[in-house]
Amino acid sequence: NSIKARDPAAKSILSIILTYPGVKAVFFHRVANFFHIAGFDLIARIISQTSRFFTGIEIHPGAKIGKNLFIDHGMGVVIGETSEIGDNVTIYHAVTLGGSSPSVDTEKQRHEKRHPTIGHDVVIGSGAQIIGPVTVGKCARIAANAVVVKDVPESATMIGIPAKAVKLENKGKFRPYGVDDKVKDEQ
């Protein structure tokens, strides 16, 4: 029902289960994550890569994902190993939740937080890149093709390269499809 509430094209639960690649990717991730936590990393990676082959969505088995993640259109989404995603998050196609550049000592980096933390009720537009161990506050909106490299405040709307806040209103209010007509540039 959370997908039907966020996607006007969703006609029935059956069509969502059978035809939405994001639903399949999240299901496979939950299975892969189970094996990852249990220490069966190879099995987890095989499940993850099989899911990627069938859905076009790559979610590392180590990523932590909350309830009701909706990946709409999905193709090209990449979610890195130390990513954390809150509840009721919507992600559109070609989004990357990626790590910052590798350090000289990649062994050291294996045990560090390298990917973003996404709060509850966030919407991430198509093509957006959220890079490094940044935090995106709850109810934030990341515009299409924005590049986020710094923390994002709660309820902010971020646009541009690098992303900048254009709106800080309605704190804590969930707006499934984005912004009002009154978008202010706060530069």
Locations of regions flagged by a protein language model:
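Extended, non-globular alpha-helical segments
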Residues: 43, 47, 90, 96, ...
